[in-house]
């Protein structure tokens, strides 16, 4: 009977231990939940206290460590967050969140080399974590490593095509490399996602600057085209000529009408202005898409839509009168898949 007694005693002990462990886990989850709610209310010290209670019960809690770091960063103490993030990474080495936040902290603290180190470590650990590619693109851009910024932005777009900021950093990086056609299509892609946000006017300013690059109206019927020496052998060469010819024989055009004609003419030669022979992604995702758009009959609606931040009242009135055109454009967007 002694072995049986010992077995029963052991089973009872295990049952008690499992129950206690389960209760502790539930308590930790509840404390973290309370901490998150307090953080959302801006009660950062109270939130941190809740996380500290959770960590006393379960020091190996990934969520408690990560949320502590998140709240410390929100509180304005990002460097204090790093030890908690390092702990979180040790607990879950394949999670991209921790690497991403540490990278952000170092980048904000003007330590780009450390930021790049953690973004790269994060990419190695979590290769499908989209924000790592976006953030490393931003850091590369800040370091004037525009080729690397473009490449990372492309990966970020592949992982999340609807992430407007990735479209934006692609447009900025290509612009810095004087790839004006690719930059134009990047900005237009951004504006398809964010036609009316605080960032939209800046994007539209870039678009207009690219379209008007080298083109100067010198009189009512005269235009001067200036070709920069660095554009003589590049994909930018045809852009000012195309833009000028698009409206040269037209009269009494509104700003949006002119823009529509200019967009259409440029998109029709999208593969030329992007010089995408050696960049399959740009050729498929950008050039093919915008070339199809130019031929779709939806250019007026497209132009009105992406220029809402500049001509809001006029464009909204146009959409009210042309609701079928807006619906047709929306249907076309849904039906037209952008390939990588």
Regions from the language model: what does each represent?
Residues 26-60, 67-74, 104, 108-111:
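Alpha-helical segment of the N-proximal tetratricopeptide repeat
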Residues 27-29, 62-63, 96-97, 130-131, ...:
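Helix-start (N-cap) detector for alpha-helical repeat units in TPR-like alpha-solenoids
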Residues 33, 67-70, 100-101, 135, ...:
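Canonical tetratricopeptide repeat
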Residues 40-41, 74-76, 108-109, 142-143, ...:
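Register position in tetratricopeptide repeats
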Residues 53-54, 87-88, 121-122, 155-156, ...:
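Canonical positions in the second alpha-helix
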Residues 59, 93, 127, 161, ...:
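Short coil turns that delineate tetratricopeptide repeat
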Residues 167-340:
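Eukaryotic alpha-helical solenoid repeat scaffolds
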């Amino acid at each position: 009977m002694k072995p049986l007694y010992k077995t029963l005693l052991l089973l009872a002990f295990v049952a008690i231990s499992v129950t206690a462990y389960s209760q502790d886990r539930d308590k930790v989850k509840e404390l973290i939940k309370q901490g998150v709610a307090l953080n959302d209310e801006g009660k950062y010290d109270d939130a941190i206290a809740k996380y500290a209670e959770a960590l006393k019960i379960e020091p190996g809690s990934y969520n408690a460590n990560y949320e502590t770091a998140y709240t410390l960063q929100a509180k304005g103490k990002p460097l204090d967050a790093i030890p908690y993030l390092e702990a979180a990474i040790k607990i879950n080495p394949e999670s991209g969140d921790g690497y991403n936040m540490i990278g952000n902290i170092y980048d904000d603290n003007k330590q780009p080399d450390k930021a790049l180190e953690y973004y790269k470590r994060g990419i190695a650990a979590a290769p499908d974590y989209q924000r790592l590619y976006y953030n490393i693109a931003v850091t590369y851009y800040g370091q004037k490593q525009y080729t690397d910024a473009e490449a990372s932005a492309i990966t970020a777009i592949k992982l999340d095509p609807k992430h407007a900021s990735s479209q934006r950093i692609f447009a900025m990086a290509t612009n810095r490399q004087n790839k004006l056609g690719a930059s134009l299509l990047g900005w237009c892609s951004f504006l398809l996602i964010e036609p009316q946000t605080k960032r939209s006017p800046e994007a539209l300013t870039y678009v207009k600057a690219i379209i008007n690059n080298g083109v100067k109206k010198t009189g009512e019927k005269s235009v001067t085209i200036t070709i920069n020496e660095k554009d003589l052998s590049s994909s930018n060469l045809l852009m000012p000529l195309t833009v000028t010819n698009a409206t040269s024989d037209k009269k009494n055009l509104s700003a949006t009408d002119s823009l529509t004609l200019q967009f259409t003419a440029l998109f029709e030669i999208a593969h030329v202005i992007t010089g995408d022979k050696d960049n399959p992604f740009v050729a498929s995702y950008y050039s093919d898409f915008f070339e199809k758009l130019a031929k779709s009959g939806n250019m007026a609606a497209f132009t009105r839509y992406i220029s809402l931040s500049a001509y809001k009242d006029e464009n909204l009135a146009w959409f009210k009168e042309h609701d079928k055109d807006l619906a047709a454009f929306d249907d076309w967007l849904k039906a037209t898949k952008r390939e990588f």
